[in-house]
């Protein structure tokens, strides 16, 4: 995939996507603002403690990759940064508001269930229910220019599967859950059909005995 980010780059992009929506008056962002956002104690998993020099190195790399651009001059006393990651006139990646909310939350907090994503992304986009979050995840998974998310194998004792973004790595660690589920469903259908035939035969035999 052309959109590949390391851990720090994913945190920076996630923070900029988030702040563009939640605090638009503070966007574009300065180095200090981005560093503070990256090291937030809330809404971040894992919590990081990046220095300004580490963040600056990451910003420089993202500028070279054309995922960010700098804004200076014209009254700006400090260099500001804005992302070109998605929905930019300079890039090809176009995401809906719902997709942006999910991608941002996955970048900032790692693998999560649809229910967790719906709750945690509420500041960015209000999903009507978990089903809308699930359908948006499916869209991200099935996009022609993607996939951008993958569903992971359900953990033991968990009701929901988690999803993770694919902007840092591929889907090789995802279990073929859908395939397994399809096999189980097929086996169950065959078993039901067999039982129905057995019941019908027993009814026929009973009717013959009572005749």
Curated annotation (Swiss-Prot):
SUPFAM superfamilies: Winged helix' DNA-binding domain (SSF46785). Signal peptide: none annotated. Residues 168-188 are annotated as: Disordered. Belongs to the UPF0502 family. This is UPF0502 protein PC1_1804. The lineage of its organism: Bacteria, Pseudomonadati, Pseudomonadota, Gammaproteobacteria, Enterobacterales. InterPro entries: DUF480, WH-like_DNA-bd_sf, WH_DNA-bd_sf. It holds the Pfam family DUF480.
